[in-house]
């Protein structure tokens, strides 16, 4: 028998005496340690954890991070999933029983972007992967073709919004970036070339999400908002605007990534890893997720200086 339940069904039900021969836990790297253990003890014979500890970890309050003596990466990157994977690999050296499997192909994104993510977030850990679509399987244009005006078939674009145009706000928002994104979104999403494409707008900060949503409400007519709120024939969202955390496990044809942070690197290069200066931009987990949601094109919007 197969029983599929939400994770918190059993973690919140102390009275239910239940167990299973095999327990499979999806997105295991995102589960808080104590909650993960609650699910694991339900297994009588086998536990299968599925996840990616190079992507988003379990949630930790940002204020706790700031007050600690540890960097953001040191503090939250180590999940129970990551720890158990290391233990499983170590056990393999003693008994040659394979306990950890790493998938080595991705089929979501353009091979150039797939290689970038593999080289920058996985390769040094011995977990690099290939991108068969457009390389060993068919041609790139068979899978990643898009004809949006100005970025035709271009997988990676940097849309520069300099510090001279506007500075980041104390509440972690940057209006000039939001305006630029909404300008291009309106140009492309209603075009003939973009009518069947899905669009995602990712940022690291809730205030930037609110700013972008407000600009869409102001600059799009009600009819236009109704159009972008409809799902495509396959059930896909036309548009999603959100923080990185709301995009894990999701994919869109075209993704805008709003950086927000804008500081003069020349004056603070010796503090490049300081969490208080760069916040989530020094979190490799969040960068990994934010730069791997697109299928056809990733458009990074920020200050290149």
Regions found by a protein language model. Give the residues of each.
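Conserved helicase motor core of SF1/SF2 NTP-dependent helicases
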Residues: 2-305
């Amino acid at each position: 028998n197969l029983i599929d339940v939400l994770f918190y069904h059993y973690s919140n039900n102390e009275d239910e005496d239940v167990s299973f021969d095999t327990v499979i836990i999806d997105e295991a790297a995102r589960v808080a340690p104590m909650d993960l253990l609650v699910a694991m003890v339900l297994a009588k014979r086998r536990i299968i954890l599925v996840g990616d500890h190079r992507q988003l970890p379990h949630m930790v309050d940002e204020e706790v991070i700031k007050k600690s003596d540890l960097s953001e990466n040191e503090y939250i990157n180590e999940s129970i999933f990551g720890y158990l994977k290391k233990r499983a690999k170590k056990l393999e050296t003693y008994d040659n029983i394979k306990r950890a499997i790493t998938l080595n192909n991705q089929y979501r994104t353009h091979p150039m972007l797939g290689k970038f993510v593999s080289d920058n977030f996985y390769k040094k850990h011995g977990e690099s992967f290939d991108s068969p679509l457009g390389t060993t399987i068919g041609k790139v244009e068979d899978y990643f073709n898009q004809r949006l005006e100005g970025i035709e078939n271009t997988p990676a674009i940097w849309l520069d919004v300099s510090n001279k145009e506007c500075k980041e706000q104390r509440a972690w928002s940057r209006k000039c970036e939001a305006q630029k994104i909404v300008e291009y979104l309106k140009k492309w999403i209603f075009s003939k070339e973009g009518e069947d494409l899905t669009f995602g707008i990712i940022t690291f900060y809730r205030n930037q999400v609110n700013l972008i949503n407000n600009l869409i409400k102001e600059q799009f007519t009600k009819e236009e908002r109704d159009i972008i709120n409809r799902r495509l024939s396959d059930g896909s969202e036309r548009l999603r605007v959100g923080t990185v955390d709301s995009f894990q496990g999701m994919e869109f044809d075209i993704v805008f990534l709003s950086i927000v942070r804008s500081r003069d690197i020349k004056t603070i290069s010796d503090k490049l890893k300081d969490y208080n200066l760069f916040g989530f931009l020094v979190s490799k987990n969040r960068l990994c997720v934010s730069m791997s949601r697109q299928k056809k094109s990733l458009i990074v919007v920020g200050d290149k200086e």
